[in-house]
Amino acid sequence: MSTVTVPANAGEALGMLECAAGYLADLDAAQMPTEALAGCLRGLEQADAVQAAARGQLLAAFDVTDGHLADGQRTTRTWLVHSTRVTRGQAAEYKAVQALAQEHAPLLAGLREGYVLTKSVALQLARWTRAIPGEFRAQAEEILVAAARAGAGLRELAAICAEIR
């Protein structure tokens, strides 16, 4: 049974996220056993994947409503740079994650599942599957996510993708 509190709204969820990250940042990592460090690093990677899924969905919705125009920005990418103070390179990665939400539903689902796909692997798979005709892409991505769930690494996923194409 989980003792984690479920947030009541998005603001509360963001506060909990910041609190949890702050707790981890304040740990005396030098005094932690290697096994605990490894567990934290794996957990952070999983959290990063779930955050990427959330960011992609939020950016997709923000784009649809032309939210960037309210702040006088021409595009969501420039809005990200000026309003969230990220670099252009980071904004480009966020836009790639947005594309996952809009065009690669199976890969987005793989980000949300524990330890199935990392953000970097999902983005790589999206690049590889772009060459697959649209009517077959979702099925191909489902095959790749299932292979990742079964333990396939990036090399095996590349081979599967090459075979599908």
Which role does the model predict for each range below?
Residues 1-165:
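Conserved C-terminal region and hinge/linker of Rieske [2Fe-2S] proteins, especially
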